[in-house]
Amino acid sequence: MLTDMDISSRASLKNITELGADLGLLPEEMMLFGHTKAKVELSVLQRLAGQRKGKLIIVTAVTPTPHGEGKTVTSIGLTQSLNAIGQKACACIRQPSMGPVFGVKGGAAGGGYAQVVPMQEMNLHLTGDIHAVSSAHNLGAAAIAARLFHEARLGKTEFEAQSGQAFLDIAPNEIRWHRVVDHNDRCLRQIHVGLGDNNGPEYGSSFDITAASELMAILALSHDLADMRARIGRLVLALNTQGQVITAEDLGVAGAMTAIMADAIKPTLMQTLNGSPCLIHSGPFANIAHGNSSIIADDIALRLADFVVTEGGFGSDMGFEKFCNIKVRQSGQAPAAAVLVTTLKALKANSGLATEVDSNAPNIHVPNINAPDQARLEAGFANLNWHINNVARYGIPVVVGINRFATDSDAELQWLMEAVNASAAFGCEISDAFSQGEAGAIALARTVVRAAETESQFKLLYPDEASLEAKLSTLAEVGYGASGVSLSIEAKQQAQQLTALGYGHLPLCMAKTPLSISHDPSLKGVPKDFVVPVRELVLHAGAGFITALVGNVMTMPGLGLKPGYLKIDIDAKGEIVGLG
């Protein structure tokens, strides 16, 4: 089979204006970027304000493994197949960060014959939204550092006299707004700024990857430009010496930050291999952020299509949970059905029997993940069953989609389908979207349509009015199956402080490992009798949630021993090669 890159480069594409017209966009509602992509103007929402909305489908997965489960492949393949059976469908997915593209994970355009094309344009830069987020974020960091410098240099009276601005009395050790870059760069996790003469008071700081920026979350959760402007104004950049918050509005930088992102709020329209529309917008990670594409993209697509297929990052304990408890809480748009993606490989890897973790230990034999192994499959089914029940907990009909690999055993696939059909799932189908494109997920598409016709009884996991401690306990015990939650001394103090400042009503965004339902990546399958350790609570007042840092999760990844950039180059024709 051809590589993803080869398939993408050989694709016959619709002109982007034709694609937009087929979706229902007017020419003036598209800002063209060449022939293959266009920004969608938000004026379309005003034109279609009274339009009946389509049905939203959320795609999630079992606990992820290094083998890849094919969640984006399924999202794109399902969209293609829905259009093939006569439904009008549109996909809504996140913009890939270049950190994973050049790291281990690679691109995020799907794969095989179920991908967004041209995939190299999607995976590298696209229309510049992530750069806009980085620039706006770093403007805020530069502004707070400059204000600190001038206030320290002049003192209150002289500063106010010369600048005409209020003295903010910034506490250097309470600056909460650091810097971001769209790369994996571990050496930037801890830095000191202000070093040297006349460069400002020294203070400790850091870099996060741009996908972890609160501005990225704001981009994903805003309803329109005015809402984004208001949210940016609420950003808490620092505390003063009395412990009071200093916002971007207080600093006078919110307007300029918004101006940088004025075009970034518009989703980007691209197409799949069979010419199905796909809106790409925002890129928050699901382990260290809320992990879903934008409310605006969903809203536009739902007014133009019968079915909108979106996805949450990683497993149902991660992006799906945050889709429900953060995104739906703010959008008011509940899903009609969910698709839970799994593979035979994923279940064997999640079995807890000679897993990849064990392979790091000497003298332990790890079976071939592609070989039939009924014992590992049955043990790993517990993980799938947990995720089925987790999705069903939210009152959503769940369809299991099994991504077929060429090495899969027919007998094992049959056993898995029978096991799923005896579970709480609405249905189960095998998908060959990777190898067959739109023809490979027809059965999945038909079952999803039937599931979406049932009456969804969507419900949130916890109410707004619950205390922060109660929300943490619910997420740990109900959301992950933990026996409890433990807060560090710092986290307890932060919970009290955030409640006192009036932020206790906000939902929680759990930042934890995606490689286990628990906080510990070595605990496979369905962990039991564990306590979730919360080390820190971080306020994101603009985005409208509080992040709980769990275990050893980091907001700046690092490059591995064999990073993806080693394979990427330009050939003699000037074409990008090695991207996948």
From Swiss-Prot:
Q: Which Gene3D superfamilies match?
A: Domain 2, N(10)-formyltetrahydrofolate synthetase, Formyltetrahydrofolate synthetase, domain 3, P-loop containing nucleotide triphosphate hydrolases
Q: Which domain of life is it from?
A: Bacteria
* GO BP terms in the entry: tetrahydrofolate interconversion
Q: What is its EC number?
A: 6.3.4.3
Q: What class of enzyme is it?
A: ligase
Q: Which residues form the signal peptide?
A: none
Which reaction is this enzyme known to catalyze? (6S)-5,6,7,8-tetrahydrofolate + formate + ATP = (6R)-10-formyltetrahydrofolate + ADP + phosphate
* One Gene Ontology term of the molecular function aspect: formate-tetrahydrofolate ligase activity
**Which pathway, metabolic or otherwise, does it act in?**
One-carbon metabolism; tetrahydrofolate interconversion
Pfam families xref list:
FTHFS
What's the protein here called?
Answer: Formate--tetrahydrofolate ligase
